Amino acid sequence: MVLFSEDHIQETRRRGRIEVICGSMFSGKTEELIRRMKRAKFARQRVEIFKPAIDTRYSEEDVVSHDSHSIASTPIDSSASILLFTSEIDVVGIDEAQFFDDGLIDVCRQLANNGIRVIIAGLDMDFKGNPFGPMPQLCAIADEVSKVHAICVKCGDLASFSHRTVKNDKQVLLGETAEYEPLCRECYLRARGEDGQKI
C-alpha cells in the first residue's frame, strides 16, 4: 500500500500579477506599498523593492513614507535595471512609478508573465491634473488597481488632486508639504483658478 505518492503532489506554481496603488500626494500610497511588501516578507517570500534614483527626499536608498515608515530598497535610474535584480524574486515593489521611463510598462508585464507579483505605487496625475508618466498604462494592464485618497486640506472631503503651492511649472518637482497640498476636485479647481492656471 502506498501512503504517499509523488503523483498526488501538486506543484505550487507562482502566479504573476500586477497591482497598482495610485492616488494623490499624502494619500498613503507608499504606506500601502510598504505594508504589502512587509506582509510578503513575513510569509517568507523573496522580495525586492525599487525606487527612482532621483527621489532622495527622505533617504537615498530606503523607500520612506510621509509618516516615516521605511523599507530597504534599490535606487535605479532606468526601469530596465529592475530585470537585473529579479531572477530569484517572488515579489517586486516599485515606488514613485510616475518618475520612471515608459519602459517600466513592458518590464512589469514581463515580470508578471514570469510568475512574479508586481506591486506598484505612484501618482496617477501630475499637479495640472494630467495623467502622469507610465501610470495610466500601468493601471490599464494591472490585475488590480487600488485608488487611495488623501483628505482635502481646505474642506475635509476626499482628495484626488495634488495642488502645487509654489510657482514652478516643471512637471517633476520633488516635494513635501511645503510644495504640495491634497485637494478635492472643487477646491482644486478653485485653487487653480486663483493661481491663474488653465483649468
UniProtKB/Swiss-Prot annotation:
Keyword annotations: ATP-binding, Cytoplasm, DNA synthesis, Kinase, Metal-binding, Nucleotide-binding, Transferase, Zinc
EC number: 2.7.1.21
Active site, UniProt feature: 96
Recorded superkingdom: Bacteria
Listed SUPFAM superfamilies: Glucocorticoid receptor-like (DNA-binding domain), P-loop containing nucleoside triphosphate hydrolases
GO BP, sorted A to Z: DNA biosynthetic process; thymidine metabolic process
Alphabetized Pfam families for the sequence: TK
Substrates-to-products reaction catalysed: thymidine + ATP = dTMP + ADP + H(+)
Gene Ontology MF term list: ATP binding; thymidine kinase activity; zinc ion binding
Protein location: Cytoplasm
Record-linked InterPro entries: P-loop_NTPase (IPR027417), Thymidine_kinase (IPR001267)
Enzyme class, first EC level, given as a word: transferase
Residues annotated for Zn(2+) binding in this entry: 152, 155, 184, 187
Cellular compartments per GO CC: cytosol
Positions of ATP binding: 23-30, 95-98
PANTHER family: THYMIDINE KINASE, THYMIDINE KINASE, CYTOSOLIC
Family to which this protein belongs: Belongs to the thymidine kinase family.
Self-association state and partner proteins as the record states: Homotetramer.
Name recorded for this polypeptide: Thymidine kinase
Gene source species: Bacteroides thetaiotaomicron (strain ATCC 29148 / DSM 2079 / JCM 5827 / CCUG 10774 / NCTC 10582 / VPI-5482 / E50)
